[in-house]
């Protein structure tokens, strides 16, 4: 059974800083209001989403095994390979040649790759299986459509 897949690896490349405005108020979901009077600052999404540019890459998500963690089909994962893949982190793993995104469980010598959707079972990593952790997911970018 294919649990979940990630596709299209893309390296983050250093480029021009793109500062986006951040407004100092919470947006009401009702009547629109003029916003420019409330401009607080500008942010660069590179700074907000990427701590280690030379060890960060982006993956596109397919499948629904991680929807409970806010990782939706069609979303993009920001992955940092310099972060230690510890218990509880969401990781990009290759198990027996298959790429997946799951929450890492490491306790008392047991390693599991845990989905965040009750439709799927945990992947218990057996000693004879090959497991490689590519990196830790640091951010998720999901479409709203």
Segments predicted by a language model, with ranges:
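Short, positionally conserved secondary-structure boundary motifs
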Residues: 1-67, 99, 139-145
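Hydrophobic beta-strand signal
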Residues: 78-79, 92
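Structural motif
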Residues: 74-75, 89
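Glycine- and charge-enriched low-complexity intrinsically disordered segments
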Residues: 22, 106-145
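A short glycine-leucine-enriched loop at secondary-structure breakpoints
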Residues: 68-72
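Short, compositionally biased
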Residues: 87-101, 105-111
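Short coil-to-beta-strand transition motifs
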Residues: 73, 95-100, 131-132
């Amino acid at each position: 059974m294919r649990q979940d897949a990630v596709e299209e690896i893309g390296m983050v490349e250093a480029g021009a800083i793109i500062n986006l405005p951040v407004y100092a108020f919470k947006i009401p979901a009702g009547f629109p209001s003029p916003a420019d009077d409330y401009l607080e600052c500008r942010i660069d999404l590179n700074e907000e989403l990427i701590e280690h540019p030379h060890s960060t890459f982006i993956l596109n998500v397919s499948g629904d095994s991680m929807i409970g963690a806010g990782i939706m089909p069609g979303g993009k994962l920001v992955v940092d390979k310099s972060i230690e893949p510890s218990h509880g982190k969401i990781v990009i793993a290759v198990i027996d040649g298959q790429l997946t995104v799951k929450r890492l469980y490491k306790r008392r010598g047991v390693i599991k790759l845990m989905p965040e959707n009750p439709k799927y079972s945990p992947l218990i990593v057996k000693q004879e299986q090959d497991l490689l952790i590519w990196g830790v997911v640091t951010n998720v970018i999901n479409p709203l459509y």
